[in-house]
Amino acid sequence: IRDAARTSIGSVMPAKSLELKHTIKLIQELTSEINEIEDAIRKIMDELKPPILSIPGMGFYSAAMILAEVGDFSNFNSPDKVLAYAGCSPSTYQSGKLTNCYAHMEKRGSRYLRYALYTATKYVCYWNPVFTEYLTKKQAEGKHYNVALSHATKKLVRLIYALQKSGKAYLAIT
């Protein structure tokens, strides 16, 4: 009876129970595919040994997303170009000799990179005292949390750029 109860579904309609069995099987297949892909990402990251993983609070998958989206950092002349690629640079308006800078982010770049940087910044600000202090300083200046976090994101991009260009691990300044 117990075996029958484990394999059966509490539904009178056979179509619903068949649909549920197929849905469960599909979820199990997708879960195994996700695990396989995550293992492949982990192997690639173990081979690369990127210096950005030495930043306290930098997550494994955030680092993988950032590296996958940016690719080769030598394609960018400066961290500002990486910020612009992510869509985190301030929007500008130009007409003739007038150049005006607005306070809003452009959000024209890679939304995946922007998401990975934003998520990584939250954790780095929590685990890294240098970034925690920077975030607190920006909030003390009267900036909204999200604005302060965008400033911390810019600081993180500058750090990631420097680490990837130099190939050296992060050393905290105490």
What is each PLM-predicted segment?
Residues I1-T174:
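A detector of single, family-specific signature residues
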